[in-house]
Amino acid sequence: MPVASLAKVSVSPAAAGDFTVRAPCIYGKRLVSNRVSFGKLRRRSCIGHCVRSELQTSRVLGSVTDLSLDNSVENGHLPKGVSWAVHKFGGTCVGNSERIKDVADVVVKDDSERKLVVVSAMAKVTDMMYDLIHRAQSRDDSYLSALDAVLEKHRATALDLLDGDELASFLSRLHEDVNNLKAMLRAIYIAGHATESFSDFVVGHGELWSAQMLAAVVRKSGLDCTWMDARDVLVVIPTGSNQVDPDFVESEKRLEKWFSQNSTKIIIATGFIASTPQNIPTTLKRDGSDFSAAIMGALFRSHQLTIWTDVDGVYSADPRKVSEAVILKTLSYQEAWEMSYFGANVLHPRTIIPVMKYDIPIVIRNLFNLSAPGTMICRQIEDEDGYKLDAPVKGFATIDNLALVNVEGTGMAGVPGTASDIFSAVKEVGANVIMISQASSEHSVCFAVP
């Protein structure tokens, strides 16, 4: 049954100009909290009524692996700050050769001094790669013909976009990758099983190919451009909940090393994929490219992160359910986080955390309607005295297909550990509880799970 809510999340206002983020963090094997205080900073206005703080006091509770506490990279060879603009293009935006040309045109026309572009795999390619693994695990010989279809999709796209040495170089790399994939899929076929690292390695090839093609198209316009395999830079730590936590300290070190060997003003980076501290390929899971872009934005301290989609911005409600839904011009980080957590098609909730630490605004724009200004997500609006303004309801979000479980009985009242036993059983089956309600009589406990 549908459940609609916009509950408070653990992002709360502190003193004027401050904010507090509460997030789980891992130190050894314990969950801990770290409070990080930034120096007093100067505030300047962004677009419209949004505020961008260059150097504003903030308190952040987050993972010790989420934030570099030193500025050693700031003084190195890699320039950081407002000179960088970060763009992210999803699979729909790079779905075919014409759309890749449109993306390249946006990149070329952006007048930012330096640009980092994060790209997903071409539309449907990630699903095709997962299907390859499924067929190989099932010992279905058709995985070979399915791999040929993936090869042909990218070969045909490259033929439309590239020529000369750029085409020859890409096709050589493409065929080399496909030969490696055949060997890996053959191993999966024989074993009848694919490890998570094997699966992540196979699935991540879509981003590698789209990044290389886009970089080559940008170079055709006469601009210096280099593509980045994010596995060489982005380091994440897998958690037990099928998620990963970015290791900013190690990622900054690797980024500095990468940039010293690839100094350029335009970088086309792969989304979705990363490496573990042991250099094992991994992914940021579904919708991970948005998360990749947010992490990169934080690493480069960019002045803005633009996420390009096929919609004009963030709607006040699902337009398929509410015909009067309108595009929102602005959202605070907290509002966007809450709406996305409760089912709105905005961003993955984790995408907001890295950019919020550095007050980097996120702009949601439509690649296919460049005249639409989109939606800006930034710090909550303040009045002239620095107090956060209370906004009216911005939107509604729903989560469909939930199950409500009610556990009741007269023997539950006053019995210690009943709730612990219930939710331990829920944890054992891997279910995520998103709402809990208990009667004051203690005779029942109700909770919602997907």
Question: Model-predicted segments: where are they?
Answer:
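Generic beta-strand/beta-sheet core signal
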Residues: S120, M228, A269-G271, W308, ...
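A conserved regulatory-domain signal marking ACT and ACT-like small-molecule sensing domains
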Residues: P2-V9, C25, L41-R43, P373-P450
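Glycine-rich beta-alpha junction loops
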Residues: M122-A123, D232, V311-G313, I362, ...
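Short flexible/disordered coil segments
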Residues: S289, S332, R365-T375
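Nucleotide/pyrophosphate-binding catalytic subdomain
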Residues: P2-I352
